[in-house]
Amino acid sequence: ESGQLGSFTKCYWGHPAYKLPSELNLLATAHYLEALGMQAKASRIAAVLGGKMPMHMSSVPGGTTYTPTMDGLQAILYMVREINEWVDRVYLPDVLAVAPYYLEMAHQGRSVGNMLAWGVFEEASRKPEERLLPRGMILDGKLEVLQPDEAQVTEQVTHSWFDGEGALHPYEETTQPRYTGYSPDEKYTWVKAPRYNGKRMEVGPLPRVIMAYLAGNQQAKKMVDSTLQALGVPGQVDLLFSALGRIAARVIETKMIADAMERWTLEIMGNIQAGNTALYVPHEIPDSAQGVGLWEAPRGALGHWNVIRNKK
């Protein structure tokens, strides 16, 4: 009835940003639709483990409420291998095919040069700086990994609709709403502005991959170096601090996680076969305490600061 022939019609045809040849456009569009199926498959894995996706329900302090079975893990392993094969066959080649048409994006969306990753996916050492995607930060664009101190984290409310001014550590701040109307020069948002020692920090896939690369993760080094080589800019890691670099980082991170998922599934299956079926270590809630959990969400660094008083 609308006259629109499909979901991708009536776009900005003729715009100079449309650089791909028609064959590559068709291929990328077909693969985009395939990607929706792969995304659903990944969500299905998370739902099996966590009851639903997103916001899974099986993680509790001390372990998990999910009881894995060999049948369930075999099904997960099959889906993991399907996803990993698709990443190798479609996702990686597509990005390398499209990227040469947009090399100018390596000079657009440049980062401020400050990057932070709390790290995610524990390895055997249980050290945050040795996670699959390790903890670390870089400052002022210098390719040197520093270890962040959570005590340096603050949240500013100068331009937020909350009581208070300036920046405070999460343990010290309050969240008392105070709506004063919209003013671009004063207060204009319900969002607080996190800072590290007063600095703005970029978080997300690019910082995570950069930390893995600089920490010496062999897979990250191989993939970053080969990507730069394929783009004709070997060794120029600083070009990743850009719009193009963020796209490349998403691909590299996806491949690292896809490989690790197969390894993790096999490890759990091995534990069950060896009789190691412990799921949960009970913990007594103290009368008073405070603590912080530092992790990663897909969008970037995530911190939860908690204070317990009277067991609450």
Q: For the regions a protein language model found, what residue spans apply to each?
A:
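Active-site and channel-lining beta-strand-loop segments
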Residues: V292-K312
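Active-site bordering "gate/hinge" segments
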Residues: E1-R299
